[in-house]
Amino acid sequence: MAAEPKAATAEVVKMDLFEDDDEFEEFEINEDWLEKEEVKEVSQQWEDDWDDDDVNDDFSRQLRKELENGTDKK
């Protein structure tokens, strides 16, 4: 009789592991998503001024100096 309560507690633990599955929505396997949703193509992938960085700012000068020092040590 001692084995029966242990089996019941083991089953309760297994059920607790799978209770979080209720948070996910289930979908049909054969659903065709492309027909239901419009696919929009984005023609512009980046900003027009993406290359307007100042290469002579403090950070760029410090980085260039560190790179030069690193190559001198080798």
Swiss-Prot record:
Annotated SMART domains: DSS1_SEM1
UniProt KW keywords: Proteasome
Gene Ontology cellular component terms for the protein in this record: proteasome regulatory particle, lid subcomplex
Disordered: region residues: 35-74
GO terms classed as biological process: mRNA export from nucleus; proteasome assembly
Basic and acidic residues: bias regions: 58-74
Disulfide bridge positions per record: none
Statement: the UniProt record of this protein carries the keyword Repeat: no
Keyword Ribonucleoprotein: no
Transmembrane segments: none
Pfam families noted in UniProt: DSS1_SEM1 (PF05160)
InterPro entries referenced in this protein's UniProt entry, alphabetically: DSS1_SEM1
Comp. bias intervals (Acidic residues): 46-57
Quaternary structure, from the entry: Part of the 26S proteasome. Interacts with BRCA2A and BRCA2B. Interacts with UCH1 and UCH2. Can form a tripartite complex with both RAD51 and BRCA2B or both DMC1 and BRCA2B.
Functional description taken from the UniProt entry: Subunit of the 26S proteasome which plays a role in ubiquitin-dependent proteolysis.
Family: Belongs to the DSS1/SEM1 family.
PANTHER family for the chain: 26 PROTEASOME COMPLEX SUBUNIT DSS1, PROTEIN DELETION OF SUV3 SUPPRESSOR 1(I)-RELATED
Protein name per Swiss-Prot or TrEMBL: Protein DELETION OF SUV3 SUPPRESSOR 1(I)
Taxon lineage: Eukaryota, Viridiplantae, Streptophyta, Embryophyta, Tracheophyta
Gene responsible for this protein: DSS1(I)
